[in-house]
Amino acid sequence: MRTINISLQEIFNEIPSEKREETRLSFAISNRLDALMKEKGLNKKQFADALGKRPNEITRWLSGEHNFTLATIAMLSTFFEKPIISVE
């Protein structure tokens, strides 16, 4: 039986840098939404109801794996009256 001798760092280094950045941004947006929901005292159901969405869609948004469109980010920024992301 062969032994696989590869470290997590080696695996991480094989992931293209743009994919790592995409993942970082996705989780940053999810974390921002979670923080803004807590700030407003909203749970997933209340947030979904306020936006006319289903709770499972909010769960997907908070998973860190959702590919947000600019339209959705703009809608969320308007809802919270705060930026979701900033562009420098």
PLM regions: where:
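DNA major-groove recognition helix of helix-turn-helix/homeodomain DNA-binding modules
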Residues: 71-86
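Short alpha-helical DNA-recognition segment
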Residues: 41-59
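Recognition helices and adjacent regulatory flanks at domain boundaries
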Residues: 22, 44, 86-88
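The alpha-helix within a helix-turn-helix
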Residues: 37, 48, 77
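Generic structural marker for isolated residues within well-ordered, non-membrane alpha-helices
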Residues: 33, 44, 73
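N-terminal flexible/basic segments that precede or flank functional cores
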Residues: 1-35, 39-40
